[in-house]
Amino acid sequence: GTNFAIWAAAATRVELCFFDDVNGKLVETKHELTHRNGPVFHGYFPGIKPGQRYGYRIDGEWNPARGWRFNPNKLLIDPNTHLLYGDLKYVPEIYSHQASDGVGTGNITIKDERDNAQYVPHSVVTANVKSDQVRLRTPWSKTIIYEAHVRGLTAFNLDIPEEERGTY
């Protein structure tokens, strides 16, 4: 089985959604995470194994002026996932607000009710493997820290449209 947990302090409801391909069709199964410890919603699912695709749908107040854009119609990836399945498709349905194109042009105060699951990557359950990475112990005397500024890096880059070069 697999434990799932997500921090969502201002959320009122969190659904964990599993995705499977059945006869060439994407099938979604939703499970409300009813266990909550403070800001963390969580649950254990005994039959879930590595390879299972999933995502979260999180509900709460829609108040763009406060930065709250909860929209249960939008599938979110797990911020702690180690693996993603699928590509992001730039279509209006991926935005939480009503967008008219793939770059999000539209009215950001109106919630979009369309589902986005077929257009966004899904998180994938991976095996619980201990990391064999070893922390580098480079002494400060041999450490180099590079500092870069967007303006300086882009001012003369010919791959960037001229009107955007050197801007933030």
Q: Which sequence ranges carry the predicted segments?
A:
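Short, intrinsically disordered, charge-balanced linker/junction segments flanking boundaries
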Residues: 165-168
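Residue-level recognition of well-ordered secondary-structure positions
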Residues: 7, 55-57, 149
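Insoluble glucan recognition modules
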Residues: 1-29, 33-34, 45, 144-146
